[in-house]
């Protein structure tokens, strides 16, 4: 795992088209902004896991 330190307003790049910007820090919460092309799905981990669980529960036709 790559670990990076960023300050509010600073950005990191993932590939050529995805940016992650630190928008704010309040207590133990960090607000981040993700800018990605429409074809790149961006989800919180718990939402992604729910989507994957729903996909695995669907019966194939």
Curated annotation (Swiss-Prot):
Homodimer; the beta-strands of each monomer intercalate to form a hydrophobic core, while the alpha-helices form wings that extend away from the core. Belongs to the CsrA/RsmA family. It comes from Sodalis glossinidius (strain morsitans). GO terms for cellular component: cytosol. A key translational regulator that binds mRNA to regulate translation initiation and/or mRNA stability. Mediates global changes in gene expression, shifting from rapid growth to stress survival by linking envelope stress, the stringent response and the catabolite repression systems. Usually binds in the 5'-UTR; binding at or near the Shine-Dalgarno sequence prevents ribosome-binding, repressing translation, binding elsewhere in the 5'-UTR can activate translation and/or stabilize the mRNA. Its function is antagonized by small RNA(s). This is Translational regulator CsrA. The keyword RNA-binding applies. Its main location: cytoplasm. GO terms for biological process: mRNA catabolic process; negative regulation of translational initiation; positive regulation of translational initiation; regulation of carbohydrate metabolic process. The keyword Acyltransferase does not apply. InterPro entries: CsrA, CsrA_sf. Pfam families: CsrA. GO terms for molecular function: mRNA 5'-UTR binding. It is found in: Cytoplasm. It comes from the Bacteria. Keywords: Activator, Cytoplasm, Repressor, RNA-binding, Translation regulation.
């Amino acid at each position: 795992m790559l670990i990076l330190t960023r300050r509010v307003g600073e950005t990191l790049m993932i590939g050529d088209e995805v940016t992650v910007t630190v928008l704010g820090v309040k207590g133990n919460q960090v607000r981040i902004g993700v800018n990605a092309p429409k074809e790149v799905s961006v989800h919180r981990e718990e939402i992604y896991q729910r989507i994957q669980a729903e996909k695995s529960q669907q019966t194939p036709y």
